[in-house]
Design a protein with these regions (language model features):
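Mid/C-terminal beta-alpha module of Rossmann-like enzyme folds, strongest
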Residues: 83-142, 154, 176, 187, ...
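Glycine-rich Rossmann NAD(P)(H)-binding loop
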Residues: 33, 61-67, 95-102, 111-113, ...
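A conserved pocket-lining segment of Rossmann-fold NAD(P)-dependent short-chain dehydrogenase/reductase
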Residues: 48-72
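A conserved structural motif in NAD(P)-dependent oxidoreductases
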Residues: 70-77, 169
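Glycine/proline-rich active-site loop of Rossmann-fold NAD(P)-dependent oxidoreductases
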Residues: 19, 33-48, 84-95, 118-119
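Short-chain dehydrogenase/reductase
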Residues: 1-13, 40-47, 70-71, 102, ...
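Conserved C-terminal active-site "lid" loop/helix of NAD(P)H-dependent oxidoreductases
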Residues: 74, 132-164, 183-186
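Active-site Tyr-X1-5-Lys
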Residues: 1-25, 29, 34, 54
C-alpha cells in the first residue's frame, strides 16, 4: 500500500493541474478511537493485548520499543479535517493532520500498564523475526512501517487552517478506550489462537536468547 500511495497522489495532483479537479490530500498517520488503540503486536483486536496484561501474561513489542510514533485520535483528526473542507487555501495541496507529539512504543505500553494497575512485562522481539511469522502478516506492519521512527512537520496545516489543535493525548486516549470497552463488554472478545501463538513465540525466543548467551 505504501508503494501505491505516491502514484495515487501524483494522479490526483495531475488531475488538479490539468483539469482543475479540486483535490486536497490529508495524511493522518495512525488514527485511533473508542474501540481501537495504537499497539505493536496484536491479534484480531486490541483487546487481545489488554487481556494478556490483565492476566499477567507478557506482551510482545517489536524491536527495542524505542522507535517513535505519532498517535492521532479520531476526534482531533476530524476537528482539523473539517477546516480543510471548502477552504480555498487547501485546494491542490497535501497536509499532515497528525498529533505533533511523538511517543515511543514502550511509552504507549507503559501507560497502558499504568492505567490497568499492572507491572510492565514486555518481551521485545526484532521486527525481522516477527516478519517471519506464517500465521500473521507482520511484514507490512513492521518492516514497512512501525520499525521506523517517525517525526512529522505540522507547520503547513497550522498555516492554512484557523484552529489546529490536538488536545487528546495518548494518555487520555488510552483511558477513553478502556472506559468505552468497560461500557461495551460485548467487544471484549477472547482470542485464544493469538494467546497460544504469543506464548509459543515467547518460549522459542527465550530459548534462542539462552542459547546465544550460553555460547558467546
Amino acid at each position: 500500500m505504501d508503494k501505491i500511495k505516491p502514484n495515487v497522489n501524483n494522479y490526483f495532483f495531475k488531475a488538479y493541474q490539468q483539469f482543475g479537479f479540486p483535490i486536497t490530500i490529508v495524511r493522518p498517520s495512525q488514527t485511533y478511537g473508542y474501540d481501537r488503540i495504537p499497539l505493536s503486536v496484536k491479534g484480531k483486536s486490541c483487546w487481545s493485548v489488554v487481556e494478556r496484561i490483565l492476566n499477567d501474561q507478557p506482551v510482545i513489542v517489536h524491536g527495542d520499543g524505542k522507535s517513535t510514533w505519532h498517535c492521532t485520535h479520531t476526534f482531533d483528526f476530524a476537528d482539523n479535517f473539517i477546516q480543510l473542507i471548502n477552504n480555498e487555501k487547501t485546494i491542490g495541496q497535501a497536509y499532515h493532520n497528525i498529533n505533533p507529539r511523538f511517543v515511543t512504543w514502550d511509552m504507549i505500553y507503559h501507560e497502558l500498564y499504568r492505567l490497568l494497575n499492572k507491572q510492565p512485562h514486555i518481551v521485545h522481539i526484532p521486527s525481522d523475526l516477527l516478519a517471519m511469522s506464517q500465521k500473521y502478516d507482520h511484514t507490512t506492519a513492521f518492516l514497512g512501517d512501525k520499525q521506523y521512527s517517525c517525526c512529522y512537520d505540522m507547520s503547513k496545516i497550522k498555516r492554512d487552517i484557523d484552529h489546529f489543535d490536538h488536545h487528546i493525548s495518548i494518555e487520555k486516549g488510552l483511558a477513553m478506550y478502556l472506559k468505552y470497552m468497560d461500557a461495551h463488554p460485548e467487544l471484549k472478545i477472547k482470542d485464544d489462537e493469538y494467546n497460544e501463538w504469543c506464548n509459543h513465540l515467547i518460549d522459542i525466543y527465550h530459548q534462542v536468547e539462552k542459547t546465544v548467551k550460553d555460547n558467546l
